[in-house]
Amino acid sequence: MFEKLKKKFAEIFHRKKIDPDEVADEIPLKLVEADVSLEAAEDLASLVRNKLKEDTTLDPNEVLSSSILEMMPEYKFDVLNVNKKPFVVLFLGINGTGKTTTIGKFAHYLKRNGKSVVIAAADTFRAGAIEQISLIGREAGTEVIRHDRGSDPSSVAFDAIEHARARNIDYVLIDTAGRMNTNKNLLDEMKKIKRVSKPDLTLLVIDAVSGQDSVNQARMFEENVGYDGVIVTKLDTDARGGSILSIYHDLKKPVLFVCTGQGLDDIMPFDRNWYVRKLIPEPENETA
C-alpha cells in the first residue's frame, strides 16, 4: 500500500545532507509520478522548504510528517454519534468505484456498532443494480427498500426514509446511479434525490487507483450535486498513494472512510496520522 509514494519520499529525504532548495525542487517532480497533483506537490514543497530553512536541526522525516498533516486538516466527525434519527446518508460515485459494495461495508460497520440500518436501492437504471444492492444488503444483514427497475429513484429514497421513521431505524443509506459522470440526466436525477431525501451526510465514493481522474470526478460532483466528504476505495491495490493528499489539497474535502479490501469488514474511519505513518520512509534505509 502506497509503496510508490513512500519510495519517492525516500529518494528525496534519505541523504545525510539535506538542502532545502534541492528537496523542494525534487518534490513536485517525483510526487506527480505517485498521483499527487502538481498543485499539492508544489505546496508541500514550499512547506518543507520553509520548515527546513527555519530550523536546520529538524529531522527531515518529522518535517515531512508535519507538512503533510498541515495540508490535511483534522476533521472531527463520528458517524456513530449523531443526534438525528433516521440519519440519512446519500452515496454518489460513478460505476467502477465500488460504490455499491462500499454501501454494504458501511451498513456492516454501522450494524457492527449496534446501529439499525436500511438501504434504499435508488439506482433503478443500471441492469442488475437492484439485485446487486439487495444481495449486498442481505450479506450485511440489512433490509433493502426496492422498487422495479426504471422506477423513480427519488420515490425509493422517500419510501426508505418513511420506512425508517415508522420503525425507529437509525440510518438510511441511499444508493444512486453511477453512469458516466458527464451524463446531464443522471446529474439532474441526483439533484432531485438530494432535494427529496434531504440527506444529513452526502458521501462521494472514489477509488484510489484512478489518480487525477478521481479528483476530476470529485470536482464535477461538487459543482453539480455537492457532497460533504469522501470514501476512498481500493486502497489495498493502490501502489501510488497520492490521491488522498490531492483530495484534501485540491478539493478541500475530508476523507471520512477508506476501504482496504474485499470483505465486509474492510472499511475503517480515515485517520490522517495512519496515512502519514504509511508514507514516511524508514530511517535505517538512509543513504549518503
Curated annotation (Swiss-Prot):
GTP binds at residues 93-100, 175-179, 233-236. It is a peripheral membrane protein. The keyword Transport does not apply. SUPFAM superfamilies: Domain of the SRP/SRP receptor G-proteins, P-loop containing nucleoside triphosphate hydrolases. GO terms for molecular function: ATP hydrolysis activity; GTP binding; GTPase activity; signal recognition particle binding. It catalyses: GTP + H2O = GDP + phosphate + H(+). It is found in: Cell membrane; Cytoplasm. Transmembrane segments: none annotated. GO terms for cellular component: cytoplasm; plasma membrane. Keywords: Cell membrane, Cytoplasm, GTP-binding, Hydrolase, Membrane, Nucleotide-binding, Receptor. InterPro entries: AAA+_ATPase (IPR003593), P-loop_NTPase (IPR027417), Signal_recog_particl_SRP54_hlx (IPR013822), SR_rcpt_FtsY (IPR004390), SRP/SRP_N (IPR036225), SRP54_GTPase_dom (IPR000897), SRP54_N_sf (IPR042101). Disulfide bonds: none annotated. One of its GO terms (biological process) is SRP-dependent cotranslational protein targeting to membrane. Pfam families: SRP54, SRP54_N. Its EC number is 3.6.5.4. Belongs to the GTP-binding SRP family. FtsY subfamily. Involved in targeting and insertion of nascent membrane proteins into the cytoplasmic membrane. Acts as a receptor for the complex formed by the signal recognition particle (SRP) and the ribosome-nascent chain (RNC). Part of the signal recognition particle protein translocation system, which is composed of SRP and FtsY. This is Signal recognition particle receptor FtsY. It comes from Thermoplasma acidophilum (strain ATCC 25905 / DSM 1728 / JCM 9062 / NBRC 15155 / AMRC-C165). The lineage of its organism: Archaea, Methanobacteriati, Thermoplasmatota, Thermoplasmata, Thermoplasmatales. The gene is ftsY.
